[in-house]
Amino acid sequence: MAANDKEKWGIAHIFASFNNTIITVTDLSGAETVTKSSGGMVVKQDRNESSPYAAMQMAANVAAIAREKGIVGVHVKVRAPGQGKQRSPGPGAQAAIRALARAGMRIGRIEDVTPVPHDSCRPKGGRRGRRV
């Protein structure tokens, strides 16, 4: 088996908050960006940037460009805002993973890389928390 017959894999970094979704495909080292897309690149309204529809469109665009550059499969790293903010990914995360698979990309590992504090900064909201 020659060296050029080897399949090329990448990493799909999906940042999904409740305001936006950003998908970046890098090489396996994570140093070189192959392609990226965000909610504002595919929809007009700000409120739709985090929607599953926008995530599906972004994933399809990203998958097409990545396949042109020779990437056949991706390992997925899902990230939410984390730290003192929301620790669960937004609505676009699952739709993006599903759309990547539908676009013909092979999915390797799916990993949650949300930053979780080990008792560092005091969360905002004061002593009694946020009162609604």
Curated annotation (Swiss-Prot):
Family membership noted in the UniProt record: Belongs to the universal ribosomal protein uS11 family.
Gene name in the database record: rps11
Pfam families, per the entry: Ribosomal_S11
Organism: Methanoregula boonei (strain DSM 21154 / JCM 14090 / 6A8)
Assembly information from the UniProt record: Part of the 30S ribosomal subunit.
InterPro entries recorded: Ribosomal_uS11 (IPR001971), Ribosomal_uS11_archaeal (IPR019961), Ribosomal_uS11_CS (IPR018102), Ribosomal_uS11_sf (IPR036967)
Name this protein carries in UniProt: Small ribosomal subunit protein uS11
Role: Located on the platform of the 30S subunit.
Stretches for region Disordered: 108-132
GO cellular component, one term: ribosome
